[in-house]
């Protein structure tokens, strides 16, 4: 299986921050990677485009992927509402690691987070399935618009997304 690369065009209050590219580990985590890739392209009729990062915690992560309700309570995968943890072999080794947000075991949907630091306490609990390949500095810059309580001071949006 080919490791796809997707992109996000990120904006802050409608102003461009830049484009990040994300390599998906489809060779090891194919089902999770395919869900994210398809939600990036919109080929199933729904997508990440226009959704926001609703939870940003400096020194920890930036969470997004709720395109059904922009407040973090919505979740929808290409497989239905939720799907099982595929495997938990990848570690949360540092800034730029892409992982599934969940509400416990086997509750993956569309929500994801990008790590801003090493988060080893998430190993074995969240499926890490990709890594920011280019422009991780944009992810790091978005941290400045978050607070410890996970609220955001600016609207950070995925203005466009797709696959290279």
Swiss-Prot record:
Note from the entry: It is one of six related genes or pseudogenes found in a cluster, thought to result from gene duplication, on chromosome 1.
PANTHER family on file: PEPTIDYL-PROLYL CIS-TRANS ISOMERASE, PEPTIDYL-PROLYL CIS-TRANS ISOMERASE A-LIKE 4C-RELATED
GO CC terms of this entry: cytoplasm
Catalytic activity annotation: [protein]-peptidylproline (omega=180) = [protein]-peptidylproline (omega=0)
Organism listed in the record: Homo sapiens (Human)
UniProt similarity note: Belongs to the cyclophilin-type PPIase family. PPIase A subfamily.
Record keywords: Cytoplasm, Isomerase, Rotamase
Record has Isomerase as a keyword: yes
Role according to the record: PPIases accelerate the folding of proteins. It catalyzes the cis-trans isomerization of proline imidic peptide bonds in oligopeptides.
InterPro entries the UniProt entry points to: Cyclophilin-like_dom_sf (IPR029000), Cyclophilin-type_PPIase (IPR024936), Cyclophilin-type_PPIase_CS (IPR020892), Cyclophilin-type_PPIase_dom (IPR002130)
Official protein name in the record: Peptidyl-prolyl cis-trans isomerase A-like 4D
Molecular function in Gene Ontology: cyclosporin A binding; peptidyl-prolyl cis-trans isomerase activity
Entry's EC annotation: 5.2.1.8
Domain PPIase cyclophilin-type as annotated: residue spans: 7-163
Gene name in the database record: PPIAL4D
Gene3D superfamilies (alphabetical): Cyclophilin-like
Localisation: Cytoplasm
């Amino acid at each position: 299986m080919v490791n796809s690369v997707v992109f996000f065009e990120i904006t802050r209050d409608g102003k461009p921050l830049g484009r990040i590219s994300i390599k998906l580990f489809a060779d090891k985590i194919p089902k999770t990677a395919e869900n994210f890739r398809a939600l990036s392209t919109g080929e199933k009729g729904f997508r990440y485009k226009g959704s926001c990062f609703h939870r940003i915690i400096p020194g920890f992560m930036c969470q997004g992927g709720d395109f059904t309700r922009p407040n973090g309570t919505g979740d929808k995968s290409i497989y239905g509402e939720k799907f099982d943890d595929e495997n938990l072999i990848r570690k949360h080794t540092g800034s730029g690691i892409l992982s599934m947000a969940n509400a416990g075991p086997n509750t993956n949907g569309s929500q994801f987070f990008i790590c801003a630091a090493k988060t080893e306490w998430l190993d074995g609990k969240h499926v890490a399935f990709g890594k920011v390949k280019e422009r991780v500095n944009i992810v790091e810059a978005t941290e400045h618009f978050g607070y410890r309580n996970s609220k955001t001071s600016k609207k950070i949006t995925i203005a466009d997304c797709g696959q290279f």
